[in-house]
Amino acid sequence: MNQQNLQAAKHRVLAYCDAFDHASESDMISVLRLHTHDEYSWRGMYPFHELSGHESVIELFWRPLKSAVSHLQRRPDVFLAGGHSLALHAPEPNSKQPLSDDDVWVCQMGHFMGLFDRPWLDIPPHHRMLSIRYVEFHRVVDDRIAESALFIDLISVMRQAGQNPLPPQTGASFVYPGPRTHDGLLFSEHPECEGVKTLQLINRMVADLSRANQHALETSDNAVPVSTLATTWHEDMIWYGPEGIGATYTLERYQHQHQYPFRFNLGSKTFNGHVARFAEGNYGCFFGWPNLTNTATGGFLGLTGSTLPADMRIVDVYRRDGDKLAENWVIIDLPHWLSMQGLDVLVRMRQLLGKETFV
């Protein structure tokens, strides 16, 4: 991938973020139009899903959020760009800007922070600081953003506001830090060979999981030896999972607090591919729409099983340290996955708050 193209795409996304974050309420649509294609498309977590057109994105997502969370500021921890091989990914998404091997994707990860002063999605405000985990992807074509995908941890927002839609989680809950090395904002050029190393390592890790899934289908053995993980992960790895699962530290605790509940309590797993998977320097990322389809057999998230297959839209951001992965930030659109099984966490919250009736 041409470094000039990567840097130009980064500059476009940074310019957009700066202008949009400082735009007045009346200027948000004009700023979005300035930096994006006319047929701009947007993907978001439940309950927003896929939106087309600038007005829809502003009126359905951004304006309600910014009205509810006063003084909203963006606090990025990771920023990278890269091209991608179409062979790695799912079929072309519903976009009027067709995919190309020359496209550049830009990823930014961090927290939105502000004061939760008004209801959002009927989540009651607590009038205190709110930290919203986010990962945002932009596909840049001809120096304009053709499509975006924004994932936030909605269940974390609910829990910070005193709403608890899920049983106690297996991992820890806190405001997750950025990279231990504090070098995740890749504004300048980085040697292409380092990004290649990172992507190859991520691909090898994904391939190991695919083989484990196939073995489980053939033998019903969902266990994965820690020695298998240790070929691609440092022993003191950190996994920052979504609220409802939580964060975990070291390979041993990762297996017991996330991997085994995930592997043993979810069946019929089908990998659907990734929309984008790329790396730059020591950092890499991907997201799918959905990445994975599975069926809850009982126990995952502390919930009962279901006979209904459900889709997981998953974001992963990685940091490589040497020849192994050291940190992994993950957002899963769990509310969407749950809604496909008949549990709408926002509807249930509204019912409990007396804002919506059961019939």
Q: What is each of the regions a protein language model found here?
A:
Residues 1-359:
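C-terminal and inter-domain tail/linker signature
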